[in-house]
A protein has these predicted regions:
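Outer-membrane beta-barrel biogenesis signature
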Residues: 19-89, 190-194, 217
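Repeated loop/turn-to-beta-strand initiation elements of outer-membrane beta-barrel proteins
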Residues: 61, 123-126, 175-180, 236-239, ...
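Transmembrane beta-strands of outer-membrane beta-barrel pores
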Residues: 67-73, 132-136, 172, 186-192, ...
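Extracellular loop and loop/strand-boundary signature of outer-membrane beta-barrel proteins
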Residues: 49-51, 98-102, 148-156, 210-216, ...
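Outer-membrane pore/translocation modules
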Residues: 131-244, 301
């Protein structure tokens, strides 16, 4: 278990004390901020793939629903592509057979996220979200010896409520078209971590095994979420930056690795009701900590070390205002990937969502 980075806790706590002590003295700033909030435009929200990118004024609420699709294929070690035959030469760390015999071919992951925000004061916005995961992976099984011929193909699937999180956004600055806020939150992974599936064995028969880590709905862990977000508006343009982290605070046998993320984006109005966006996202994820002794199939995804790495994605999106609410769409693709491998790389991703404020 990793230690929590208390720098974030101190930052947000001090921000909370400062902003609350200034609330009664900051009416001029508040009125100025309300003036800017009243200038509704499609770029009021960041790209739909961002979370916690904006705060609300006192008494305002928002509900949202988002759908995300991500596809993965082609195995990598580091930033280099590797073939099935390359992977079949790797040792099986869990005994027999001596070499890996099952190789992932592609994977689809679908997520549905239900969210809500509410601002009890002008300086604090509360945010919560529940996430449902749907995963499907195609794999190929090879003979364990001799020519290593293909035995056959098979598919594993899983779905469940994955996680629930709750955060508070603390407004630090809101003036002259500049906005700056901090986020501190808690996330609980609630899905099952010991789901089983039918796996094609090297000898040609099917057996029921605990699915590898990447196919589980969650790791049953708890994490601390933190972020800092800054945006600046120049007439029809808007620039933004966000740094965020997710740090494991408690887990059972194992947990997915800690992550750090940097987002930089630009938005521009297309007309009075729509705006396009361009976003760069860099993410670093550590490998899995711990292990489940029942996950021991002769496949790369059964090894906790074959998770995590660094990715740089480029996304392009659009936000459109509706008579009630707004919709967003963003498609993204990796520019570079350096993965703890072997593991499958992301091919492309798509996210769509709807917001309604009241």
């Amino acid at each position: 278990m990793r230690k929590i980075n208390f720098t974030w806790l101190l930052l947000v706590a001090s921000t909370f004390i400062f902003t609350n002590s200034m609330e009664d003295m900051g009416h001029d700033m508040h009125d100025h901020g309300m003036h800017h909030h009243s200038k509704h435009s499609a770029k009021m929200h960041g790209p739909i793939g961002l979370m916690g990118d904006h705060f609300h004024r006192k008494g305002e609420s928002m509900v949202s629903i988002r759908y995300m699709k991500m596809t993965m294929d082609q195995n990598y070690i580091g930033s280099n592509k590797v073939s099935d035959q390359d992977i079949l030469q790797l040792a099986n760390p869990y005994g027999m057979p001596e070499k890996l015999t099952v190789v992932p071919q592609d994977m689809d992951m679908d997520m549905v996220m239900l969210g809500a925000m509410y601002a009890p004061t002008n300086f604090i916005t509360l945010m919560t979200m529940a996430t449902f995961n749907f995963k499907s992976m195609d794999l190929k099984t090879y003979q364990p010896m001799m020519e290593r011929d293909v035995v056959g193909d098979f598919t594993t699937k899983s779905s469940d409520l994955s996680r629930f999180n709750f955060s508070a956004l603390f407004k630090i600055y809101d003036r002259d078209e500049s906005k700056f806020h901090a986020q501190l939150g808690f996330e609980r992974n609630m899905g099952k971590s010991d789901l089983k599936g039918q796996v094609l064995m090297p000898m040609g028969s099917f057996g029921s095994l605990v699915l590898p880590y990447g196919m589980q709905s969650s790791d049953r862990s708890s994490s601390i979420l933190s972020a800092l977000t800054y945006t600046k508006t120049y007439d029809e343009w808007k620039l933004g930056g966000q740094i965020k982290s997710k740090i494991n605070a408690e887990s059972d046998e194992w947990n997915f690795g800690d992550s750090n993320e940097l987002n930089l984006w630009v938005q521009r109005d297309l007309n009075k009701i729509s705006a396009w966006s361009l976003r760069l996202k860099h993410q670093h994820i550590e490998s899995i900590e711990g292990l489940n002794k029942n996950i021991k199939a002769p496949v790369q995804t059964a090894n906790p070390l074959n998770y995590g790495g660094q990715t740089l994605n480029l996304g392009i999106g659009i936000n459109i205002m509706l008579p009630k609410g707004s919709i967003g769409l963003e498609a993204y693709k990796p520019i570079s990937q350096d993965l703890n491998g072997p593991q499958m790389a992301m091919n492309w991703g798509l996210q769509a969502g709807y917001h309604l404020s009241f």
